[in-house]
Each structure stands twice: as C-alpha cells, then as structure tokens.
A protein has these predicted regions:
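Transmembrane beta-strand segments that form the barrel wall of outer-membrane beta-barrel proteins
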Residues: 1, 18-24, 298-306, 366-368, ...
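Membrane-proximal, glycine/serine-rich, low-complexity loop/turn segments characteristic
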Residues: 1-160, 175-204, 242-247, 289, ...
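Residues that define the transmembrane beta-barrel architecture of outer-membrane proteins
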Residues: 2-5, 72-78, 130-134, 180-184, ...
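Outer-membrane beta-barrel translocator domains and adjoining extracellular loop/strand segments
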Residues: 22, 31-37, 104-120, 161-170, ...
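Outer-membrane beta-barrel domain signature
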Residues: 65-71, 123-129, 173-179, 224-230, ...
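Face-selective signature of the C-terminal outer-membrane beta-barrel domain
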Residues: 83-101, 129-310, 321, 328, ...
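Signature for the C-terminal beta-barrel architecture of outer-membrane proteins
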Residues: 371-377, 398-410, 414-416, 420-436
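C-terminal beta-barrel architecture of Gram-negative outer-membrane proteins
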Residues: 489-560
Length: 612
C-alpha cells in the first residue's frame, strides 16, 4: 500500500503567527528538501559548505530521473514555525523540524578502469539507508530606514545508519556505516546607512563535529572496522563601507577568516590537526557611464597555515583581479564581458597526514597541506531582446584555464583502489559555446525555445602508472515548443540529444563515442473550469556500448477535480507502461561504467485534499 499525506495548519493572532507542517509518504517522493529549505539567507560572505564525509559508497549512483520512478522510501517530516512581531520593524522567528527517511536502493554496476592491465569490477548493491535529522533555529530581524540587522542561530544533528549487502568480483561483502554530524552556527548581517556612506557587517561562526564508523565483513575472510572523528571550528567576519569617488561607488572591505580541524582515526595512529588564518583586503570600484557599467575588483589575500605533523607555518599572498562590463549596443542588444585571474586556497575540507578507508575497497591519502588553485577565465555574452516581436536570442562563449599544485594518482586492482596526491603542477582547461533563442507567436499561441552547445575539456588523468591528458568533446541540442491557443488545452513537446567523444590518448585509441536522445510530450486539458486532466510521455535512449542502446519509456496521467473551494479529488497514475529496469552507461575520465537499477513499476493513487 502506497501512502502520501501532508497537512498544514496556520494560526494568526495579533502579533503572532504559527505554522505547523507535516508530511509522510512511501511513494518515491523524498522529503529531504523540506529540511534543506529551512536554511537561512546566506550570501557569498556567510556561506561555507560543511566538510564532506570521509565514508561513501564506491559505486552507488543516483539515476538522472524523477525519484517517483525508482525511490523505495519511507519518509516523514514535521515542522513548526513561529513568528512574533515586536514592532513593525522587528520580528522574532523560531523554527523547528524533524525529518526521518529510510530508503532501500538496489543496483548493478560494472566498472572498467583502463590501463595497461585493464581492471574490471562488478557490484550488486542492496543498500538500506536510514537518516534522522533534527534542526532548530532562532532568528531576530530589525529593519528600519537607518539600520538593518539579522541574526540567526541554527543547531542541527543527524543520525545515519547504512548497510550494504554487496556481491562483488571478490565475493560477498557486507558494509555498515554510521555517521552522526552535529553543527551549531550563528550568522549575523548588518547594514548601517548614514548620510555620507553605507557600512555593512557580516559574520558567521560554526562548531561542527562528525563521528563516522565503517565495519566491513568479508564472506569467510574476516572483518575490518574503522572509526573517524572530525571536530571543526570556523569563523568569517567582514566589514565594508561604500562611498562616492568621482561620481561612482568605491567599496572597501576587510575579511578575516579562520578554520581549525582535528581529524582522529586515520591510519597514521594520531590526530591530524590543521588550521589557517586568511586576511583579505577587498577594494571594488563600480563605474556607471552612458550605455553601460563596469566593475573592477582587486582583492589581496594573505593566508597562514599550521599543521600538527609539520614544524612552523606556511604563508603566502594571493592576488585575484577581476573586471567585468555590461554594454548596451543600441536598444535591443546587450554585451557582457568578464575577465579574471583568481587565486583561491582549497580550504573546504579537512587535511590529514594519514590514509583513510572510505569503504570496503577504497583507500585515500588526502593532501597534507592546503593547495592553491589559480584560475584564468574570460567570457562574453551577447543578449538580444525585441519585446515588440517577442523574440530573444543569447550567445555565450567562455574559456577557463585552471592550475593546481597537485593531482590525484589512482591505483586500481581487483580488490582495492588506492588514491594518493602527487605534488606537481597540474592544469586543466575548457572552453564552451552556447546559443539559444526563444520566439513567441502570440496570435497562434505558440512558443519555440531552442538551444545548442559545444564544450571542450582537457584534464590530466593518472592511474595504474599511466599519465596523459584527456581531451573530451560534448555537443548538445534541445528544442521545446508549447501551444496554448485554446483555453481548455495546453500542449508542450521537448526533445534533446547529446553526443560525447574524446581524442586518442595513452589509455585508449578509440574515441569513446556515446550518444543519447530524449523527448517528452505533455498535454493538459481543462474540459470544465474545475477539472484538470493531464498526461505526459517521455523516452530516453542511451548508448550503453558501441552500437547497443537502452530505451526507457515512461507514461503518466492524472485527473484533478475541484469539488468545492475547500475540497478536491484526484487520481494519478505513474509509469503506466510498467517499466521495471533502468539502464545507462557513461565515461568518467577514461573509465567506463554500466549501471542498472530496478524501478518501482506501475502505481496508481487516489487523493483527497481539504482546506478549512
């Protein structure tokens, strides 16, 4: 039996507002996004990603399709939002939520790692993944003519248990993963508007820790257990002011950033402690002129790092000039140009001086010092829009060249994978061309939206003692048309195709050419004002190997009947063709992967919606 339920209740009384929200389902619709959406209004200065987990499945893959076709889940969500207005300009918000989810994922994966001695690996995974998340936030906001202030304190904790019964090329393997990430974060933003200038302040402070454990049972050959613990402290503070210079805006900003990480449980046998301080001076000048505007940014950074496994500190300066301009060419055409040279330290994830077991077969020696990525880029965008004829066109051309001071070397064997950093200059480059147009024929009720793109990527690959640059090409074209001339029927059709290939290299003499085609048709019918019937059909064809294709077709339909303003009935059917298997193949670098997963099959649901 498939169940999908959701209920909301709203109470408004004087200066108080209360919203209660609850949902649960087991019909392939994950509710995790409801928990993510509680996050705050974060900008470039207050956003910092949480450290990635060390443990992961080596091959588990999420299909590029709607979850309702494949997700075997039991999900529930409960949220409570309270707002109290002290005055017209100041409010207090309290949010709390709890999210629980259990999914069962099955797939079969064949991977081919290309080298002088090509290694082939197969896995039949059955993963049961359970997550429970609790979050709470307290936010205060003040908004007056002279002062804007926002402060939000958020706390969260997640419990995750995952078990994988895996049949592999080395026999039966059972994996058990436990993770418990916890975080406490405060974000403060403020703006002070004075007659002479504008002052702004932003601050983020976060405490984070994660305990992870991995237990592996090899069929008949014993077991292995690992435990990792990460404790991380992060803060970033920025102050800036804006004032007039020669009739334009000059922004002067200063940023101070600090992070401290402690990783315990690697094969080094001791804790890996690392930390850094970054000080940034950030001048930016905006120029407005007849027919356009320009912006010049000249930030200078100083970073100082310390590691427990190394004496002393390492430090360096980084300069990242950036300039862009927007030009109006006539009344219909706009050109946007940007050039930049960015130097950025890779500070997102913790460093270690030991080897970490990521899963039953993958071991990684992570970088033991902060690396710097140097990016040169240039791009041009031309935009044409004619409101009188309802026609628009965009052309984009971009080039990027990235240099890093290390790259990862991979060693693939039948029973393990080992990744280690090689500290040597490493570069990758890409350029792309994209063109799109849209035309609306108002009298005919017809719209046409078309696009095409081409991209070229060059990157270094190193595995099993072979190193070479890979040169990949990809082309894509798509066309979408819609027709809504009649008020009681709407039609839309989308079709797209992709082709990817690479040049000859040391890993392969073939071009690794793969093609796929996709199209979807949707019809919405409104025979009377309170009845809405819909149907959609989609088909995707993947080339899984040279000359061999897999086709996936899906047909869905439904009817919604609004009996009253407060009552509606609906019937929906998903996967009417009862497609049971999804297949695809793709290249990751030089390596080939074939993927197969079971689908949920045909399902129908009757729904009742009440408002009161």
């Amino acid at each position: 039996v498939r169940v999908r339920q959701r209920a909301k209740a709203i109470s408004i009384a004087g200066n108080n507002q209360l919203l209660a929200d609850g949902a649960m389902n087991n019909c392939g619709i994950g509710l995790g996004q409801l928990a993510v959406d509680m996050n705050t209004l974060e900008d470039a200065y207050t956003y910092e990603p949480e450290p990635k987990s060390f443990l992961y499945s080596p091959t588990y893959h999420v299909p590029p399709m709607s979850q309702r076709y494949y997700l075997d889940n039991k999900s529930s969500f409960a949220g409570l939002n309270f707002l109290h207005a002290f005055t017209k300009s100041s409010v207090l918000r309290v949010n709390a939520l709890y999210y629980a989810d259990t999914t069962v994922g099955e797939d079969s994966v064949f991977s081919r790692y290309v080298a002088d001695d090509t290694v082939s690996i197969f896995e039949n995974n059955r993963i049961t993944d359970s997550r429970n998340t609790a979050k709470m936030s307290l936010a205060y906001e003040l908004n007056t003519k002279k002062v804007y202030l926002s402060d939000r304190l958020t706390g969260s904790i997640t419990w995750r248990d995952a078990a994988n019964n895996n049949t592999t090329n080395i026999g039966k393997v059972e994996e058990f993963i436990y993770q418990k990430p916890r975080g406490l974060q405060n974000i403060l933003t403020a703006e002070l508007n004075t007659p002479s200038r504008l002052y702004s302040l932003s601050s983020v402070f976060r405490l984070y820790d994660n305990a992870e454990s991995l237990s592996v049972v090899f069929g008949g050959d014993g077991s292995d257990s690992r435990m990792l613990k990460l404790k991380s402290t992060f803060m970033r503070n920025r102050v800036a002011t804006v004032f007039d210079l020669f009739g334009n805006s000059l922004t002067l900003g200063y940023i101070m950033e600090h992070k401290h990480n402690n990783v315990a449980g690697t094969q080094s046998g001791h804790s890996s402690v690392s930390g850094y301080w970054i000080h940034t001076a950030e001048p930016m000048y905006e120029i407005n002129f007849s027919g356009g505007s320009a912006e010049i940014s000249l930030p200078v950074e100083y970073i100082s790092c310390r590691y427990s496994w190394r004496d002393g500190r390492t430090a360096r300066f980084m300069f990242s000039p950036h300039a862009d301009a927007s030009l109006k060419i006539g009344n219909l055409l706009t050109a946007d140009v940007a050039v930049a040279y960015n130097q950025a330290a890779d500070t997102d994830n913790p460093l270690t001086d030991g080897v970490v077991a990521n899963n039953y077969r993958t071991y990684t020696k992570y970088p033991d010092s902060i690396s710097v990525e140097r990016t040169s880029l240039a791009n041009l965008r031309l935009s044409y829009f004619d409101a009188s004829s309802m026609f628009s066109c965009n052309v984009y051309a971009g080039w990027t060249h990235v240099r890093r001071d290390y790259y990862m070397k991979y060693l693939y064997a039948g029973d393990y994978t080992f990744a280690t950093p090689e500290w040597h200059d490493n570069s990758r480059s890409s350029w792309s061309l994209v063109a799109s147009l849209k035309k609306i024929y108002t009298r005919a009720g017809l719209s046409v939206d078309a696009s095409c793109s081409y991209s070229y990527n060059k990157a270094l690959a190193s595995q099993n003692g072979i190193e070479d640059y890979l040169r990949y090409n990809a082309m894509n074209a798509s066309l979408t048309t819609g027709w809504d001339k009649l008020s009681w029927i709407n039609l839309s059709v989308t079709c797209a195709g992709n082709v990817s290939w690479k040049r000859h290299d040391c890993f392969s003499e073939s071009g690794d050419l793969l093609k796929n085609v996709y199209y979807t048709v949707r019809m919405d019918v409104y025979p009377v004002s309170n009845v809405h019937a819909y149907s959609d059909f989609s088909q995707t064809t993947f080339e899984v190997s040279h000359g061999h294709y897999s086709t996936n077709c899906f047909w869905n339909a439904g009817v919604i009947y609004d009996v009253l303003k407060s009552l509606s009935l609906s019937v929906s059917a998903v996967n009417l063709l009862d497609r049971r298997v999804y297949e695809e193949a793709f290249y990751t670098g030089v390596n080939y992967q074939y993927y197969r997963t079971p689908l949920r099959g045909r399902e129908m649901m009757v729904s009742v919606r009440l408002k009161f």
